[in-house]
Amino acid sequence: MALPILLDCDPGHDDAIAIVLALASPELDVKAITSSAGNQTPEKTLRNVLRMLTLLNRTDIPVASGAVKPLMRDLIIADNVHGESGLDGPALPEPTFAPQNCTAVELMAKTLRESAEPVTIVSTGPQTNVALLLNSHPELHSKIARIVIMGGAMGLGNWTPAAEFNIYVDPEAAEIVFQSGIPVVMAGLDVTHKAQIHVEDTERFRAIGNPVSTIVAELLDFFLEYHKDEKWGFVGAPLHDPCTIAWLLKPELFTTVERWVGVETQGKYTQGMTVVDYYYLTGNKPNATVMVDVDRQGFVDLLAERLKFYA
């Protein structure tokens, strides 16, 4: 039986590819998709979800727009990474359907209520919508199997020296998620920076030759340009968000550790840092499964195999 999932995302090139991977995988049943502000403004990330589902001919999936800003802060966006539209590069179709007439939290709550079994929430943007759901619907916590997030890192940041972008945008929301008591799986920069797509991988995807694999290759063409900056020291582009979906499909591709994680909300230099208690120094019980390594070739092979679904 397919695993029911709720996808909360802020497309964003890597979010878009996570959607492609999830919907090409019969092991997963995507019940709904909600948009969060992050990689671009809330209007643009919502539009990008609708554009991707139009491209994939999955306009049957309910979509709702989430919070327009973080819980306690002004919104920061990553338009320098993802371009003016949030999905610059390919010519994507205009949406052919409308979002639900409700908020992301309302759609999430409805989906959880109606599901016969606990649902896995996959969150690849800031954690604002998920935190609002947890705070407003404590009665539904038991309907959440786990929360798989792309965010954080054990020792480095990509937005500040200490903080990864998704957590930095809304650290208070991320702290609510980590301390919720619900199992959390964290795909942080420690693993996503190893999940790099090289130029030859992009050409492999392009050669698959269907409309979706072509769009994915064009998304990666744009994404690779940003990551050519020498400061990163990358060979290719790190495909952050699809690591969450890949872990659900093939956990054996990833090395993980069970650790306690907290989020710094106050620090002068460390605001938004995920503090991972690697050596069990706090005495706190582990609250997260933290990804630390990935079989890069296996990850690329999984993407290539699933892109053939769209032939």
From Swiss-Prot:
GO biological process terms on file: nucleobase-containing small molecule interconversion; purine nucleoside catabolic process; pyrimidine nucleobase metabolic process
Function in brief: Hydrolyzes with equal efficiency cytidine or uridine to ribose and cytosine or uracil, respectively.
Keyword Iron-sulfur: no
NCBIfam families: PRK10443.1
Organism: Escherichia coli O7:K1 (strain IAI39 / ExPEC)
CDD domains in UniProt: nuc_hydro_IU_UC_XIUA (cd02651)
Keywords: Glycosidase, Hydrolase
Tagged with keyword Lipid biosynthesis: no
Record EC number: 3.2.-.-
Cellular component GO terms held in the UniProt record: cytosol
Molecular function in Gene Ontology: purine nucleosidase activity; uridine nucleosidase activity
Protein name according to UniProt: Pyrimidine-specific ribonucleoside hydrolase RihA
